[in-house]
């Protein structure tokens, strides 16, 4: 009985904040962006500090070591746990661990202070003031760059993608923090991304003769194969049948299938 009580308490604490109601992004589709700001979209793990605990986007409590959060503020901040580009798997592994290993590689890159008053810059100023009194290497405020025009936006996107970044976030700095999917904060990527369910593996040929060559997956677009984007380890240990993966693509074929679909990562 004691074991089950302990287990119940563990799950209760892990999911106590299961509905964090964070601000989520819509997609940029040529909307007017005069007076807006932009920043790099970091490919990490969402981190929401509620003033006492660090939570995921789903509201699950993370287990950072004490040194990591020692100088975090007594108010909410929203950001992305991130180390460097193309390290999503490592970031994800670190944040899922209960041992606390590897957190020294991460920072919480903050893009908003949800409960502060004023526009975006005034909200972020509250965090800046706190950091002057309580400096920490584990919080960094993401630079917000004023957008001159759409040409400037796409030039910045090209710069980010040339550095292997995920994309760009463009937002209205005069809008409040909205705890929903908001039309005031938009994501922009050259390659679109979607999810699908793996339904089959196919043996490779040539250099991939002894590993997976491609897989078939299925979503609202139907069934289609994905054979590129995998590294050798992913071909040797492919996403299991029934798992959900994310793929990138560039447009739609006449038959409604994704064009140039490439594997990105397994959703976990």
Swiss-Prot record:
Query: InterPro entries attached here?
Result: DNA_ligase_ATP-dep_cent, DNA_ligase_ATP-dep_CS, DNA_ligase_OB, NA-bd_OB-fold, NAD_dep_DNA_ligaseB
Q: Which domain of life is it from?
A: Bacteria
According to the UniProt entry, where is the signal peptide? none
Q: Which reaction does it catalyse?
A: ATP + (deoxyribonucleotide)n-3'-hydroxyl + 5'-phospho-(deoxyribonucleotide)m = (deoxyribonucleotide)n+m + AMP + diphosphate
Cofactor list = a divalent metal cation
* EC numbers: 6.5.1.1
Which controlled-vocabulary keywords does the entry list? Answer: ATP-binding, DNA damage, DNA recombination, DNA repair, DNA replication, Ligase, Metal-binding, Nucleotide-binding
- GO MF entries: ATP binding; DNA ligase (ATP) activity; DNA ligase (NAD+) activity; metal ion binding
Enzyme class comes to: ligase
Which residues are responsible for catalysis?
41 (n6-amp-lysine intermediate)
GO BP of this protein:
DNA recombination; DNA repair; DNA replication
Quote the record's binding site residues for ATP: 111, 181, 187
Family matches, as NCBIfam families:
PRK09125.1
Similarity field: Belongs to the ATP-dependent DNA ligase family.
Function according to Swiss-Prot or TrEMBL: Catalyzes efficient strand joining on a single nicked DNA.
Q: What is this protein called?
A: DNA ligase
Organism annotation: Haemophilus influenzae (strain ATCC 51907 / DSM 11121 / KW20 / Rd)
């Amino acid at each position: 009985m004691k074991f089950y009580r302990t287990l119940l308490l563990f799950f209760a604490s892990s999911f106590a904040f299961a509905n964090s109601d964070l601000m989520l992004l819509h997609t940029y589709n040529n909307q007017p962006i005069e007076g807006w700001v932009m920043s790099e979209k970091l490919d990490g793990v969402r981190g929401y500090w509620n003033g006492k605990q660090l939570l995921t986007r789903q509201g699950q409590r993370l287990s950072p070591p004490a040194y990591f959060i020692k100088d975090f503020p007594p108010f909410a901040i929203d950001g992305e746990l991130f180390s460097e580009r193309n390290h999503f798997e490592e970031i994800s592994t670190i944040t899922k661990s209960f041992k606390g290993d590897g957190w020294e590689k991460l920072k919480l890159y903050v893009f908003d202070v949800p409960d502060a008053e004023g526009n975006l810059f005034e909200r972020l100023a509250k965090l800046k003031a706190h950091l002057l009194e309580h400096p920490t290497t584990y919080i960094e405020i993401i630079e917000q760059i004023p957008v001159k025009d759409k040409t400037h936006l796409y030039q910045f996107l090209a710069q980010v993608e040339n550095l292997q970044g995920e994309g760009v976030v463009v937002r209205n700095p005069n809008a409040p923090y909205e705890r929903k999917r908001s039309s005031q904060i938009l994501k922009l990527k050259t390659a679109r991304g979607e999810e699908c369910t793996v339904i089959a593996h196919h043996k490779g040929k040539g250099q991939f003769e002894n590993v997976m060559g491609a897989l078939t997956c299925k979503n609202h677009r139907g069934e289609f194969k994905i054979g590129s984007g995998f590294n050798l380890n992913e071909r040797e240990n492919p996403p299991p049948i029934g798992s959900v993966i994310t793929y990138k693509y560039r447009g739609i074929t006449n038959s409604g299938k994704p064009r140039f679909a490439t594997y990105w990562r397994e959703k976990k």
